[in-house]
Regions:
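Short, flexible turn/loop "capping" segments at secondary-structure junctions
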Residues: 2-3, 135
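Patatin-like phospholipase
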Residues: 3-10, 15-107, 141-164
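Short linear sequence motifs
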Residues: 14, 114, 168-169
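Short coil/turn segments at secondary-structure boundaries
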Residues: 80-82, 116-121, 175-177
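Short, structural beta-strand-to-alpha-helix junction motif
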Residues: 108-125, 159
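Active-site gating loop/helix substructures
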Residues: 124-177
């Protein structure tokens, strides 16, 4: 028989759909449809970026359940009307502190510095992480990985990018002014 080994995972954004994606990934892994040790690349954006980082870190499912299901997300993501009105002015839905707070337990649980670069993250996980961000000035998608932006921090990094005549800071996987 021909064995098909899954080596690549793609996770889209979609806010609360993160929970559905997580459930599908967990059940399919438990049924041995895929194995994290065979994964070479993971692609994610927005909420899918958070799940992508979780998978790269190879936590066991019980620990992952505790992070995804039992975490008081409402204390991390304070969504209100003003947040939605200011999305374009801020060039992002949440500021950097929210993203750091979201990923902090995952990094600290594996004794990984919150300032880790994409290059170092690859060497720690041995999985090629691709996170997609949008240049809101040019409306272009940017693929961020250790191959394209090795010195960028996975969360909270510089550098300052110039897009046309406007400036936008890229902070890890999200854009912030």
């Amino acid at each position: 028989t021909i064995e098909n080994t899954i080596e690549h995972i793609v996770i889209s954004g979609g806010g609360l759909t993160l929970f559905s994606y997580y459930g599908v990934l967990k059940k399919s892994a438990e049924k041995k449809i895929w194995d994290i040790n065979n994964i070479k690349t993971i692609y994610g954006t927005s909420a899918g970026a958070i799940l992508s980082v979780l998978l790269c870190l190879k936590y066991d499912w019980e620990t992952s359940d505790n992070y995804i299901i039992n975490r008081p997300w409402e204390k991390v993501f304070n969504i209100n009307m003003y947040l939605l009105f200011d999305i374009f002015q801020r060039k992002g839905l949440f500021d950097l502190s929210v993203i750091k707070e979201s990923l902090k337990p995952l990094f600290l649980g594996k004794d990984i510095d919150l300032n880790i670069t994409f290059e170092d993250f690859f060497h720690v996980t041995n999985i090629e992480l691709h996170l997609f961000v949008t240049d809101l000035n040019e409306f272009e998608t940017i693929d961020v990985s250790y191959k394209t932006h090795p010195k960028w921090k996975v969360i909270g990094g510089e550098p300052l990018l110039l897009f046309g005549k406007a400036e936008a800071r890229v902070k890890g996987v999200f854009f912030f002014p």
